UniProtKB/Swiss-Prot annotation:
The lineage of its organism: Bacteria, Bacillati, Bacillota, Bacilli, Lactobacillales. This is Carbamoyl phosphate synthase large chain. Mg(2+) 2 binds at residues 298, 300. The gene is carB. SMART domains: CPSase_L_D3, MGS. SUPFAM superfamilies: Carbamoyl phosphate synthetase, large subunit connection domain (SSF48108), Glutathione synthetase ATP-binding domain-like (SSF56059), Methylglyoxal synthase-like (SSF52335), PreATP-grasp domain (SSF52440). It comes from Leuconostoc mesenteroides subsp. mesenteroides (strain ATCC 8293 / DSM 20343 / BCRC 11652 / CCM 1803 / JCM 6124 / NCDO 523 / NBRC 100496 / NCIMB 8023 / NCTC 12954 / NRRL B-1118 / 37Y). Residues 930-1059 are annotated as: Allosteric domain. GO terms for biological process: 'de novo' UMP biosynthetic process; glutamine metabolic process; L-arginine biosynthetic process.
Length: 1059
C-alpha cells in the first residue's frame, strides 16, 4: 500500500518536560518520527513545551512551536496551521491524553483533522480500564480478576471478597502514578483515594495481585494490511510487582521455553490485531513460573520507554517505522535502515544479551523511600550489551555512575545474614548488590529465591560473578583467570582490587598478553545478512567488526543516564557537537550508555559505541579508533571527570585545557583568578576538617552556603545558620566530596543571574543574560529564568558582561563556559564558573537562534569566532520574552521534601514565550501544569523572617478577590495588618486544619516558607505533601509567588467603588 497522498500537513505532539515516568525516550521517538515523515515528503509541524529537546530544533520539522501542551494552546496552533492529521502516539502519555481531549472537545471533528496511527477507539480500549477488560474477555485472553472502581467503597468491597494483597492501577496516568500494592484495608483506602484523585477520568482498576509471576514484555508492530511482527521480547529480572520502569530488564527473554515464548507471542499479535493499531504497541504479560498460565497486565497503544529500549537493544527503529506505517506504508514496503537490504517485516534476531538497569535519584534524595513498587521512581536508565549475561550485567552496573564498578563495591558489613535477607523485601533499588553480598556470604540461591521470587536462572548468573571474584582471589596473576574474568564483564579496576594492584597495572598486563576487546555490530539479523550499521559493543572474543575509517575522527563523550542535575540538556549538546564535527569533515564517534536518548540513535553519528563511560572503556575505544581528539565539554560532570585521567593516558582533550578545567573547580586556584581580575565575590574559605569548617564559618559569619567541590546539580549543598547545623552537615556530606575539600561561602541575599559564554581564547561572545526569578539560595536548575532580563539595571548587566569576558580570557576558555552571579546591593558578585556546556545551553540556543554547542565545537576544532562573523560582547536581545521554568516529580517521590533550596530537585523544564513577561510567565506556569485560578482561596504559612514580604503578596491576592487562609502565626500577623483571614488550627489540634482544607479542595494555592533551621518541622512538611498529593499549586519561594501574581493581575480587571 503506497503512502497516503490525501494528506500533506501533519502535526506531531511531543511529550513535554522530563518527569519520572516520561523521559528522554520521547525526544528520541519524536525526533525519529518527524524526520521520518519529512523523508516521505510531508509538511511536519511539531509542538512541544520542552526546549531541551532535539525535536524542537528548527531542522527537525518544517515548523516548530514551543508552547504549553494544553488544549487551549494546541487548539490555537490547529486553527492557525490547519493540519490534515495529528500523530499523537509518539508523545508518550501526554500526546495520547491530548488526542483524547481534543477529540472529546469536538475540535478534531470541527477542523476535519484525523488521528494517524492509532484510532481513538483503540486508545480508549487500551487505556480505559473497563473497555480493556471487556476486550480481553472478548478475545478470551486472561487478565487478573479485577473491578473498575470509581469510589473508595467499591475498592474495599473487592478486597473483602478476594482478599489481600491487591494492586491499584489508575486509568490514563503515567509511570504508575497514583498506583500501588495494598496489603491492608488502610493502605487500600489511601492508595485508592490518591489514585482516583490523579486519574483524569476518576477511575482505578483494583485487581488481585499476581506479584511473583514472571513479567514479560513484547514490542509489537502492525500495519494497515494486518502484517504484524514482534520486534523484541524482554524479560524483567524482577517478578511482577515492580513497575517495569523500575525493573532490571533483559533482552531477549532468558528463562522461557520455546513453547512459552510462542504462546505469549501469539497472544501479543492477537491483541494488536484486535485493537487495529497501525504502528507500535507495548504489551506487558505475567507468566506463572510453575505452569503455562499467563495473564495480560497492560497494553500501551503508543511508543513507550520500553520501545526506546527495544529499538536500541535490537537496532530496529520502532518510532521511525511507526511514523511510516501511520501514513499508509506497509512493513513489506519499508526498507530496514539497519541492513539497507532487508524489509522491515523481518523480526530482529539477537546474538547477544542486553541488560538494562534503572537509574534512581536516591543519591540526591537521602530521605526518599527506596522501596520499589507499582509506582515508578527512576529518573533514567542504562543499557549494556554483552555476549553473555554476566558481561552485560557488569557493564550495566559500571554505567550507572553510582560509585560501583563491580558487584563487590557496595557491601552490607553492618547487617547480619538474616537482617540482609529481611531487607531484600520489599525490593529496593540496590537489591542486585544485596543479592551479590548474600551469595558471597554463602546464602543459597534457593533461600534468596524463596524470599524474592526472582528466577533461579538470574540468581545463578549473579552467583557466577561471585565465583569468578573468588577464583581471581585464589589465582592472583593467573592469565587464564584474567581472560575468563574479562569475557564475563569484569572491569580492570575490579580485578586490580582483588589482586592488590592498580587498574593501570591490569591494563598494561592485558595489553602485554594481547587480551583486548573486539567490537561487534548490532545489526538486527544476528549476522545472517550483510549489514552496515555503525553501532557497536565491546566483548572479549576474536573477530573485530568495527572497521577503522581513513578519515580523521573525533570522539564525543555522552552524559550517561538521566539523573537530577544531569538531564537531557547534555544529550542535546552532544548531538549538536556531532553535527558540527561531521560538517567540519571529520568522522564523528559517540560513546554513551543511555538507551533513551537521541545521541544513541545509530543514524546520528558516523559510529556509535554503546559502552559504559569509564576510563577503561573509553581508552579501549581510543586504542582502536585513535581519534584526533576527545570532546568532554558536552557530557556533563560524567565527561569532565574523565578529562584528567584521559590526559594522563596521553589523550588529546579538545577545547579548554584540562589544566584550566581544573582551575575552575579548584577553589584556591579559582580565587586567585578572581583576585587578579578584581571581581566582586562572596567571602569564601576552604575546609578539609570539621574544626577547620567551623572556624571558617565563624569568621565569615552565618548564614553560609556550604558544598563539596566537583559537584553537579548542587548535590550535598546547603545553607547553614549555626555551628550545630554545620557539624551535622559535615558528618553527612564530607563523605561525598571525593577527597576534595568543602567550600564555605558567605550567603548573600539577592537575585541570581547567569550567562553562557562562547569563547575561542580571543573573542568572547555572550548570547544573552538569564535573570532568575528566585533569589540566591534556590539552585539555578530549580529557578525560573527569564531572557532577556527584565529587572536588572544596566550597570549590573554591564558588570556581568565584562566579568564574563574577562573570566573567559583568564581561564583560556575554548568552547563554552557558564558564569553564575548573585546581585547584591546593585553589584554583580561571581558565585560559580562551570568550564563546560551547562543545562541552559538548549534554552539560550533556542531563544537567541544561535546553535551554541555547534559553534563551540567548531571553535574546538580550530575555527575562529571572528571568521564566523562574531565579535566580543553581548549579542543584541530578542524582542520576545522567554521564561524557562523547572518541572518537579514530587508525586512520584512522596518522601522527598518539596521545599526548594540549594540542592537541585527538578527533573525537567518547560519554556513560555510571548511579547511581554506576564504572558510568557502565564505560558510557563500552564506548561508546568500549575493551574492559574481566576479566584479561590490562598493558604499562607510562612516563616517569621518572611512575614513582612508575605503581607504585600497577601494584599495583592486580596485585591484580586481571593480569600485568605493562614496557619496561626501567619494568620495573626495578616489580621493585625487589617487583612481578612481565616485562621486554621494546628494539624494535631482539630479537623479544621490546612491538610484537611487541601483534601477537601478548599484551597487553590499554597504558599509555604520555613526558617533555615526548621526544615523538618512537622506541620509545614505535611502541608507541602498534601498540596502535592492534591495537585494544588505549591510555592516555597516568595519570588515565584510574586511572578504568579503578576500573571493573575495581568489576566484580571480591577473593580473599584467610585463613591
Amino acid at each position: 500500500m503506497p503512502k497516503r497522498q490525501d494528506i500533506s500537513k501533519i502535526l506531531v505532539i511531543g511529550s513535554g518536560p522530563i518527569v519520572i515516568g516520561q523521559a528522554a525516550e520521547f525526544d528520541y521517538s519524536g525526533t525519529q518520527a518527524a524526520l521520518s515523515l519529512k523523508e516521505e515528503g510531508y509538511h511536519v509541524i511539531l509542538v512541544n513545551s520542552n526546549p531541551a529537546t532535539i525535536m524542537t530544533d528548527a531542522e527537525i520539522a518544517d515548523k516548530v512551536y514551543i508552547e504549553p501542551l494544553s488544549i487551549d494552546f494546541i487548539e490555537r496552533i490547529l486553527r492557525k496551521e490547519r493540519p490534515d492529521a495529528i500523530l499523537p502516539t509518539l508523545g508518550g502519555q501526554t500526546g495520547l491524553n491530548m488526542a483524547k481531549d481534543l477529540s472529546e472537545a469536538g475540535i478534531l471533528d470541527e477542523l476535519n483533522i484525523e488521528l494517524l496511527g492509532t484510532k481513538l477507539s483503540a486508545i480508549e480500549e487500551a487505556e480505559d480500564r473497563e473497555e480493556f477488560k471487556a476486550l480481553m474477555e472478548r478475545l478470551n485472553e486472561p487478565i487478573p480478576e479485577s473491578i473498575i472502581a470509581t469510589t473508595l467503597e467499591e475498592s474495599l468491597n473487592f478486597a473483602d471478597t478476594h482478599g489481600y494483597p491487591v494492586i491499584v492501577r489508575p486509568a490514563y496516568t503515567l509511570g504508575g502514578t497514583g498506583g500501588g500494592i495494598a496489603q491492608t484495608h488502610e493502605e487500600l483506602s489511601e492508595i485508592t483515594a490518591n489514585g482516583l484523585e490523579l486519574s483524569p477520568v476518576t477511575q482505578v482498576l483494583i485487581e488481585r495481585s499476581i506479584a511473583g509471576y514472571k513479567e514479560i514484555e513484547f514490542e509489537v508492530m502492525r500495519d494497515a494490511n494486518d502484517n504484524a511482527l514482534v520486534v523484541a521480547s524482554m524479560e524483567n529480572f524482577d517478578p511482577v510487582g515492580i513497575h517495569t520502569g523500575d525493573s532490571i530488564v533483559t533482552a531477549p527473554v532468558q528463562t522461557l521455553s520455546d513453547r512459552e515464548v510462542q504462546m505469549m507471542r501469539d497472544a501479543a499479535l492477537k491483541i494488536i490485531r484486535a485493537l487495529k493499531i497501525e504502528g507500535g504497541v507495548n504489551i506487558q504479560m505475567a507468566l506463572d513460573p510453575d505452569s503455562y498460565k499467563y495473564y495480560i497486565i497492560e497494553v500501551n497503544p503508543r511508543v513507550s520507554r520500553s520501545s526506546a529500549l527495544a529499538s536500541k537493544a535490537t537496532g530496529y527503529p520502532i518510532a521511525k517505522m511507526a511514523a511510516k506505517i501511520a501514513v499508509g506504508l506497509t512493513l513489506d514496503e519499508i526498507i530496514n535502515p539497519v541492513t539497507g537490504t532487508t524489509k522491515a517485516e523481518f523480526e530482529p534476531a539477537l546474538d547477544y544479551v542486553v541488560f538494562k538497569i534503572p537509574r534512581w535519584p536516591f543519591d540526591k534524595f537521602s530521605t526518599a523511600d527506596r522501596r520499589l513498587g507499582t509506582q515508578m521512581k527512576a529518573t533514567g536508565e542504562v543499557m549494556a550489551i554483552g555476549r553473555n549475561m554476566e558481561e552485560a550485567m557488569l557493564k550495566a552496573v559500571r554505567s550507572l555512575e553510582i560509585g560501583a564498578i563491580g558487584l563487590d563495591d557496595i557491601t552490607y558489613k553492618d547487617l547480619s545474614d538474616d537482617e540482609l535477607l529481611a531487607a531484600l523485601m520489599p525490593a529496593r533499588d540496590d537489591r542486585l548488590f544485596m543479592i551479590a553480598d548474600l551469595l558471597r556470604r554463602g546464602v543459597s540461591i534457593e533461600t534468596i529465591h524463596d524470599k524474592t521470587l526472582i528466577n533461579e536462572f538470574f540468581l545463578d548468573k549473579v552467583l557466577h560473578v561471585i565465583e569468578i571474584e573468588q577464583d581471581l582471589a585464589s589465582h592472583v596473576g593467573d592469565i587464564d583467570q584474567l581472560q575468563y574474568a574479562k569475557k564475563n564483564g569484569f572491569a580492570d579496576e575490579t580485578i586490580a582490587k582483588i589482586w592488590g594492584k592498580t587498574a593501570a597495572d591490569i591494563r598494561t598486563l592485558r595489553k602485554d598478553k594481547k587480551i583486548k576487546p573486539v567490537y561487534k555490530m548490532v545489526d538486527t539479523v544476528a549476522a545472517e545478512f550483510e549489514s552496515a550499521t555503525p553501532y557497536y559493543y565491546a566483548t572479549y572474543e576474536q573477530e573485530n567488526e568495527s572497521i577503522i575509517s581513513t578519515k580523521k575522527s573525533v570522539l564525543v563523550l555522552g552524559s550517561g543516564p538521566i539523573r537530577i542535575g544531569q538531564g537531557v540538556e547534555f544529550d542535546y549538546a552532544t548531538v549538536h557537537a556531532v553535527k558540527a564535527i561531521q560538517r567540519a569533515g571529520y568522522e564523528a564517534i559517540i560513546m554513551n550508555s543511555n538507551p533513551e536518548t537521541v545521541s544513541t540513535d545509530f543514524s546520528i553519528s558516523d559510529k556509535l559505541y554503546f559502552e559504559p563511560l569509564t576510563l577503561e572503556d573509553v581508552l579501549n575505544v581510543i586504542d582502536l579508533e585513535n581519534p584526533v581528539g576527545v570532546v568532554v565539554q558536552f557530557g556533563g560532570q560524567t565527561a569532565i571527570n574523565l578529562a584528567q585521567p584521559l590526559l594522563d593516558n596521553g589523550v588529546n582533550i579538545l577545547g579548554t585545557s584540562v589544566e584550566d578545567l581544573n582551575r575552575a573547580e579548584d577553589r584556591e586556584a579559582f580565587d586567585q583568578v578572581i583576585k587578579e581580575l578584581a571581581l566582586p565575590q562572596p567571602v569564601g574559605k576552604t575546609a578539609t576538617t570539621v574544626d577547620c569548617a567551623l572556624a571558617a564559618a565563624q569568621s565569615i559569619g552565618y548564614p553560609v552556603l556550604i558544598r563539596p567541590s566537583y559537584v553537579l546539580g548542587g548535590r550535598a549543598m546547603e545553607i547553614v545558620s549555626s555551628d550545630d547545623e554545620l557539624q551535622d552537615y559535615m558528618q553527612r556530606a564530607v563523605k561525598v566530596s571525593n577527597d576534595h575539600p568543602v567550600l564555605i561561602d558567605s550567603y548573600l541575599v539577592g537575585q541570581e543571574a547567569e550567562v553562557d559564554v562562547l569563547s575561542d581564547g580571543e573573542t568572547a561572545v555572550i548570547p544573552g543574560i538569564m535573570e532568575h526569578i528566585e533569589r540566591a539560595g534556590v539552585h539555578s536548575g530549580d529557578s525560573m529564568s527569564v531572557y532577556p532580563p527584565q529587572y536588572l539595571s544596566q550597570k549590573v548587566q554591564d558588570e556581568m558582561v565584562q566579568a564574563s569576558i574577562n573570566l573567559a580570557k583568564a581561564m583560556n576558555t575554548i568552547g563554552l563556559m557558564n558564569v553564575q552571579f548573585v546581585i547584591h546591593e546593585n553589584t554583580a558578585y561571581v558565585i560559580e564558573v562551570n568550564p563546560r556546556a551547562s543545562r541552559t545551553v538548549p534554552f539560550i540556543s533556542k531563544v537567541t537562534h544561535l546553535p551554541l554547542a555547534q559553534l563551540a565545537t567548531r571553535v574546538m576544532l580550530g575555527e575562529k569566532l571572528s571568521e564566523m562573523g562574531f565579535e566580543t560582547g553581548l549579542v543584541p536581545n530578542d524582542d520576545m520574552v522567554h521564561v524557562k521554568a523547572p518541572i518537579f516529580s514530587f508525586t512520584k517521590l512522596p518522601d522527598v521534601d518539596s521545599l526548594l533550596g540549594p540542592e537541585m530537585k527538578s527533573t525537567g523544564e518547560v519554556m513560555g514565550s510571548d511579547i511581554n513577561l506576564s504572558k510568557a510567565l502565564y505560558k510557563a506556569f500552564i506548561a508546568s501544569n500549575i493551574k492559574v485560578p481566576r479566584y479561590g482561596n490562598v493558604l499562607f504559612t510562612v516563616a517569621d523572617d518572611d512575614k513582612e514580604e508575605a503581607l504585600e503578596l497577601a494584599k495583592r491576592f486580596n485585591d484580586l478577590g481571593f480569600a485568605l487562609f493562614a496557619t496561626a502565626g501567619t494568620g495573626a500577623y495578616l489580621s493585625d495588618n487589617d487583612l481578612p483571614v481565616e485562621v486554621l488550627d494546628k494539624i494535631s489540634e482539630s479537623d479544621n486544619n490546612a491538610v484537611a482544607a487541601l483534601r477537601q479542595q478548599k484551597v487553590q494555592v499554597v504558599i509555604n516558607t520555613t526558617q533555615a533551621d526548621d526544615r523538618a518541622e512537622s506541620d509545614g512538611r505535611l502541608i507541602r505533601n498534601a498540596a502535592i498529593e492534591n495537585a494544588v499549586p505549591l510555592f516555597t519561594a516568595l519570588d515565584t509567588v510574586s511572578a504568579f501574581l503578576e500573571v493573575l493581575e495581568s489576566r484580571s480587571f480591577t473593580v473599584k467603588e467610585m463613591h
